[in-house]
Amino acid sequence: MIDNIIDYLYERGSIAQITDRKKLNAVLNSQPITLYCGFDPTADSLHIGHLAPLLCLKRFQKAGHRPLILLGGATGLIGDPSFKDSERKLQSFNTTQKWIKKIKLQIALFIDCNSNNASQAHIIDNYSWFSSMNILTFLRDIGKFFSINKMINKDIIKKRLKNDNYGISYTEFSYNLMQSYDFAHIYKHYDAILQIGGSDQWGNIISGIDLIKRMYKKNAYGLTVPLLTNFNNIKFGKTEKNTIWLDPEKTSPYQFYQYWINIDDKSAYHFLKIFTDISVQDINSFKNRDHSYSQAQYILAENMTQLVHGKRGLNIAQRISQNLFSYNILKLTLNDFHQLIQDGIPNIILETNTSLQEALTKSKLATSRSQARYFIKSNAITINAHKQSKIEYIFQDSDRIYNLYTLLKRGKKNYCLIQWNI
C-alpha cells in the first residue's frame, strides 16, 4: 500500500502539473476517491506514450483508490487538436468500436478490472452519453458555460488559427467542450473528483474542472503526467513515425526491447522511476555507482518488456538480441532462423542478384541510394558479420546461409534479415 500517493508520484518524477496539491492531498489522505483517465481510440493499439498515465492509474489503485478508464467512443470520432499541426483523419463508428475492443484487452494487462473490491477499475465509453444527447442540449446546457474569447486564446487554438494550410475546423474546436463535459458527467454519475492525463491535456482538464464548478458548485482536481518524447523532444503519437506500439503484432517484443536499450542515458534513469517499481533509493544508488550508465538501459528494457509482453516476450527479445549481438549468426540452425522471423526480427524478401544498395534501401537501413552509398563507403555495413565496403557490391551465393538467409547490419544496432526468393 502506498501511504501518500502524491508524494510518491512526485518522488518518481511522475507529475508534470497538479491543481491545488494541498487540498487534493488532504482529500486523498482522508478517504478513497474515484479518478479517471481518458483514451481516445485513434488506432487499434495503445503505444508507449500511454504507459505513463496507465501506470499512474495503477499506482492510485494500489493506494486504495478506484480508477475509471474512459474510452472515447464519441470524442474519438471528433479528434483532439492538442499539439497536432493538422486535422486528424476522421474514422467511422464501426472502426473506432473495433479499436475500443482491442484497447480494452490491453488496458486489462495493467489495471485490475476483476478484483471485485472497492478499488476495482471500470472501463466506460463516452459514446453512451453523447449518442443520446441532442445538439440543442449540447449548445444550451454545455456551450453556454464556455467563452469563445478564452477558447481562442489557448495555445493550440492560436497555433492552428495561424496555420494557413490547415487552420482548425469547428469539429475539432468543439473537442474541448466534449472532454470538459466528460469530466462533469463522470463527476455526477461516478463521483470521480480527479482527472489525470498527459501534460498536453492540461487545458482540457482545467476546462472540465471549471465546468464542474459552474454546473455543480463543487471542487474537482486535475493531475498530468510527463509526456514521453523521443530524442528530438517530439511527443510520441499515433501519426508520428517510429511509434512503439503495445500490440506485439505492430511492434514485436524484440523491437520493443531494443527501443529501451537504445534510449539516451539521461532518459534511462528517468524512465526507471516512472515506469518501474524499483525504489528511488536503489535507482539513485545504482546511478551513483554506474557512471557509464551502461546497465540502466538493460534493466529498463527487461522491466518494460516483461511488463508489456510478459516473461515469454522478454525471453524471446533477449534470445534474439544475444544471437545477433554476439555474432553467432553463423552458428544458428535453420529452425533458429525460422524462429527469429516468428520472434519479430526485422526481415525482408529479396530476389537473388540484388545489389547491396538496393537491399539497404528496401530494408530501410538507408533512406536513399545516396545514403546507402555513404554507409558502405563509411565501412558501416556488414554482411553476416563481415564488413563490406564495395559500393557496387552484388550479393553472392556465398552470402546465403542455408541458401536462404543473409543478415544485413548497419552500425552496431540496426539489423535486417534477408530471406532470398530462390
UniProtKB/Swiss-Prot annotation:
List the EC numbers from the record: 6.1.1.1
Q: Can you give the residue ranges of the S4 RNA-binding domain? A: 354-411
Kindly state one GO CC term assigned in the UniProt record.
cytosol
Class of the enzyme per the UniProt entry, highest EC level: ligase
**Where is this protein localized, as stated in its record?**
Cytoplasm
Q: Which CDD domains match?
A: S4, TyrRS_core
Q: Quick one: which residues bind L-tyrosine?
A: Y36, Y175, Q179
In Pfam terms, one family for this protein is tRNA-synt_1b
Locate the motif 'HIGH' region. Answer: 41-50
Annotated binding of ATP, by residue: K238
**Record note on quaternary structure:** Homodimer.
Function of the protein = Catalyzes the attachment of tyrosine to tRNA(Tyr) in a two-step reaction: tyrosine is first activated by ATP to form Tyr-AMP and then transferred to the acceptor end of tRNA(Tyr).
Q: Which NCBIfam families match?
A: tyrS
Give the HAMAP family listed for this entry.
Answer: Tyr_tRNA_synth_type1
* Family recorded in the similarity comment: Belongs to the class-I aminoacyl-tRNA synthetase family. TyrS type 1 subfamily.
Q: What is this protein called?
A: Tyrosine--tRNA ligase
Organism this protein belongs to: Blochmanniella floridana
Q: Could you tell me the gene encoding this protein?
A: tyrS
